[in-house]
């Protein structure tokens, strides 16, 4: 039952009506209505449809002041964790910030707009439908110096207050951090991790390393939130079996160091204790670890047995926003009910259904504030009964009490350094050393830490390598804080040339920038643009979208030469972030943006860059396919063309440009690397009526569309005779003519002879009409077929001869007469009887 759960968690509920108090400033007007609110330790702040903020004292609910603004109807209000800043927004994409709520001076709302960073190379947030985005979620960063804003179009932007606090501000600039495909529902933060929940997915972001990961693979569609749960030792500190066992074993011991008991707030939280909870349809929650791996699914649809007497047990409640309560529980609500759930135990702790029409619910400490659509306000207080828990005492080993590092950091450091890690029992884990260092620096032994390092340096016949304190602490700030405690005797800081970490750790690669920590004024204009390019790229991976319009907004401000320079810088950034195939990814970004018409207008160097990128991109991605093709023994050109080609319109335009200027060397350089482009050159041969080249190219390329075009435009009976000669040479001599040097080359692998392969296919499969296109099923992404028939069917006697009759190039009797000269060379059964009927009737199907 619910009350049993309340007693189990040590909770008791109190309710206070606040409607009269909050309505006091509005008693003389009916026009002004409150639209949203937030609470902090000191204040209750309401946003109104007039654009003003109404500030109340939280304890007494006394009205304090009005903060006016030009925002119009306010839709979002969020107070920072220190209670000194306020973030507000409206439905038109405007954002306001109040910097010093506790100051004595008159308060001012500083305004900016979503997409305000566009002028500096930022990424705008006007949606694909053309509507203006608006803020749907706020999240204050660490130390309340950063404000993350999620909007209705899927953009998460960062506003860095540290850039302008204490200055005269003319404007504020938002920097895009993450681009997703739809509405942001909720944003939460834990250290450098940012958790973003949209209508369809949850994304975990490391803002320092710029890494992104989607949590789970199953999509959803609706307003579903997500949050971090960080265990709070001040609440629900129930003893484990191991705790009780250790406590019992130490009862009556004279070695109990009760004076060393640390406060709960000083207890460290292990990373593996932090959990992520993501809402799912059907009153479910996904539980994931700190790395974004889904561990289990919690079902709450049938958990509340107390609801059977009051409402339908099977009713599904959508968990829209997840709000943390007392460090472990989660509060969710809809427009009629409030639920307090324990996500770890999959249990409903509290259910409230008599609070009216709910608009917003906010939490601070043990107080739950409920604001109704009818302008009512109430406070629900959850009193926590603190339970005395037996302290986990140190165990005895061989009759002697061990010294845990949380209680005796000096011993751990002295033992580790002066024994140089050679004795048994030495604690060598990274967490142990960090905890010990922190314990020493915080405690009264900080002034003696110098002697420990001196003792460590003097041990052993050889001087051991020096401990690098800054690397153990993993940040310059932590190192500086520690150095302030140490003595200033410079003689003790002489270091050996060989310095290493005592604790091996994985340091992230050096980066050009960090999205969450870097200020815009520290970057050049090009670096800002590169930053935004990389951001769009990372967001496109998470969202599975192209974002071509985003790239266009950035690239349109630069000429081609500048874009090439930006791409080189972007490649460096990707390499530093351990992106695989960074060169190819940069090429893809540019080619997705490039309009082929520009190839005719740009300078020579830029055109050469595009040509080289086209060759590199296709050779890398089509490596296996190109390796399957035979090459000329003399000149090294491919004897046949490949089927796939990435960005064929770019390659085709390059061939057209060079051919129009009779720069044939560049054309043949392209086809030597990417033989697919012989399609385009063959078209020029047909167009120019180059009989000496056209027939040979048509045969080697094997494109039905080219054969049908040539049959209509230039083929005579003599041309069909030449084509039959090429067919017999290929079939009987296992040879193909090189399109570059005209040398007859024998195929090293008979299995790659297109006519032999087609003959085997015909023997293994039923005969199909070669003009029937419905049997073709091409599932290979990137394949470009230049005709209406599968390319393999091209190399068959039936297809070639039927094309001659169907295109009405020659009459049937002339074709039969031509074939009489080849009857002893053509395999038996290679030509179907339907072809002979066509010739006799001189009609086509």
UniProtKB/Swiss-Prot annotation:
GO terms for biological process: eye pigment biosynthetic process; protein targeting to lysosome; visual perception. InterPro entries: Beta-prop_HPS5-like, HPS5, TPR_HPS5_insects, WD40/YVTN_repeat-like_dom_sf. GO terms for molecular function: pigment binding. SUPFAM superfamilies: DPP6 N-terminal domain-like (SSF82171). Residues 239-268 are annotated as: Disordered. It comes from the Eukaryota. Keywords: Pigment, Sensory transduction, Vision. GO terms for cellular component: cytoplasm. Belongs to the HPS5 family. Has a role in the biogenesis of eye pigment granules. Eye pigment granules are specialized forms of late endosomes or lysosomes. Biogenesis of pigment granules in the eye requires molecular components required for protein delivery to lysosomes. PANTHER family: BLOC-2 COMPLEX MEMBER HPS5 (PTHR23287:SF18), RUBY-EYE2-LIKE PROTEIN (PTHR23287). This is BLOC-2 complex member HPS5 homolog.
């Amino acid at each position: 039952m619910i009350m049993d759960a309340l007693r189990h968690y040590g909770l008791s509920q109190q309710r206070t009506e606040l409607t009269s108090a909050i309505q006091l400033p509005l008693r003389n007007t009916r026009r002004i209505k409150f639209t949203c609110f937030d609470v902090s330790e000191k204040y209750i702040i309401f946003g109104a449809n007039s654009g003003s903020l109404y500030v109340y004292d939280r304890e007494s609910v006394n009205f304090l002041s009005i903060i006016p603004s030009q925002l119009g109807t306010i839709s979002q209000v969020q107070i920072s964790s220190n209670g000194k800043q306020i973030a507000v927004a409206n439905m038109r994409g405007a954002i306001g910030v109040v910097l010093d709520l506790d100051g004595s001076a008159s308060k001012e709302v500083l305004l900016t707009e979503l997409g305000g960073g566009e002028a500096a190379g930022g990424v705008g947030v006007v949606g694909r439908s053309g509507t203006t985005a608006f803020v749907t979620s706020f999240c204050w960063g660490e130390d309340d110096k950063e404000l993350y804003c999620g909007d209705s179009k899927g953009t998460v932007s960062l506003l860095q207050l540290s850039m302008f606090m204490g200055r005269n501000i003319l404007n504020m600039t938002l920097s895009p951090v993450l681009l997703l495909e739809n509405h942001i529902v909720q944003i939460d933060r834990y250290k450098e991790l940012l958790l973003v929940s949209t209508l369809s997915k949850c994304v975990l972001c490391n803002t320092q390393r710029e890494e992104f990961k989607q949590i789970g693979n199953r999509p959803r569609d609706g307003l579903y939130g997500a949050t971090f749960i960080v265990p709070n030792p001040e609440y629900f500190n129930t003893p484990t079996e191991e705790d009780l066992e250790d406590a019992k074993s130490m009862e009556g011991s004279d070695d109990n160091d009760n004076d060393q008991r640390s406060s709960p707030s000083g207890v460290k939280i292990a990373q593996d204790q932090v959990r992520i909870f993501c809402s799912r349809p059907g009153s479910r929650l996904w539980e994931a670890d700190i790395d974004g791996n889904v561990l289990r699914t919690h079902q709450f649809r049938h958990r509340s047995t107390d609801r059977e007497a009051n409402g339908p047990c099977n009713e599904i409640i959508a968990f829209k926003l997840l709000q943390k309560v007392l460090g472990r529980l989660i509060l969710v609500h809809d427009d009629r009910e409030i639920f307090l759930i324990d996500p770890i135990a999959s249990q409903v702790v509290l259910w409230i259904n008599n609070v009216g029409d709910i608009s917003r619910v906010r939490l601070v400490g043990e107080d739950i504030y409920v604001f109704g659509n009818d302008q009512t306000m109430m406070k629900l207080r959850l009193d926590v009964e603190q339970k005395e828990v037996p302290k986990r005492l140190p165990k005895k080993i061989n009759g002697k009490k061990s010294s845990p590092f949380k209680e005796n950091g000096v011993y751990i450091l002295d033992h580790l350094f002066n024994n140089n890690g050679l004795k048994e029992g030495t604690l060598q884990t990274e967490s142990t050393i960090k905890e010990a260092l922190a314990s020493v620096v915080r405690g009264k032994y900080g002034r003696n830490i110098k002697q420990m390092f001196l003792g460590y340096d003097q041990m052993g016949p050889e001087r051991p390598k020096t401990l690098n304190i800054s690397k153990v602490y993993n940040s310059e700030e932590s190192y500086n804080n520690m150095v302030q405690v140490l003595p200033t005797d410079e003689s003790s800081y002489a270091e050996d040339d060989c310095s290493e970490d005592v604790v091996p750790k994985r340091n992230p690669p050096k980066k050009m920038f960090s999205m969450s920590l870097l200020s815009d004024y520290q970057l050049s204009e090009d670096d800002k643009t590169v930053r935004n390019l990389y951001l769009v790229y990372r967001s496109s991976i998470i969202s599975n979208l192209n974002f071509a319009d985003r790239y266009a907004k950035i690239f349109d401000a630069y000429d081609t030469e500048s874009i090439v320079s930006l791409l080189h810088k972007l490649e460096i950034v990707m390499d530093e972030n351990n992106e695989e195939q960074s060169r190819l990814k940069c090429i893809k970004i540019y080619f997705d943006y490039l309009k082929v018409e520009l190839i005719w207008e740009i300078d020579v160097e830029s055109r050469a860059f595009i040509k080289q990128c086209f060759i590199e991109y296709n050779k890398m991605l089509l490596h296996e396919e190109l390796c399957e093709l035979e090459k000329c023994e003399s000149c090294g050109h491919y004897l046949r063309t490949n089927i796939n080609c990435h960005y064929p319109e770019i390659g085709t335009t390059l061939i057209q440009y060079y051919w129009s200027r009779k720069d044939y060397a560049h054309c043949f350089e392209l086809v030597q690397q990417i033989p697919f482009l012989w399609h385009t050159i063959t078209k020029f041969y047909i167009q120019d009526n180059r009989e000496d080249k056209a027939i040979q190219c048509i045969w080697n390329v094997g494109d039905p569309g080219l054969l049908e075009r040539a049959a209509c435009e230039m083929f005579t009976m003599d041309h069909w005779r030449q084509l039959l000669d090429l067919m017999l040479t290929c079939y009987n001599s296992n040879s193909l003519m090189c399109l570059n040097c005209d040398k007859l080359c024998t195929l090293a692998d008979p299995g790659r002879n297109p006519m032999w392969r087609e003959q085997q296919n015909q023997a293994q499969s039923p005969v199909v009409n070669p003009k029937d296109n419905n049997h073709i099923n091409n599932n290979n992404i990137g394949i470009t077929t230049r005709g209406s028939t599968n390319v393999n069917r091209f190399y068959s006697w039936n297809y070639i001869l039927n094309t001659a009759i169907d295109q009405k190039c020659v009459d049937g009797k002339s074709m039969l007469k031509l074939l009489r000269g080849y009857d002893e060379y053509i395999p038996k059964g290679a030509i179907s009887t339907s072809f002979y009927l066509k010739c006799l009737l001189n009609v086509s199907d």
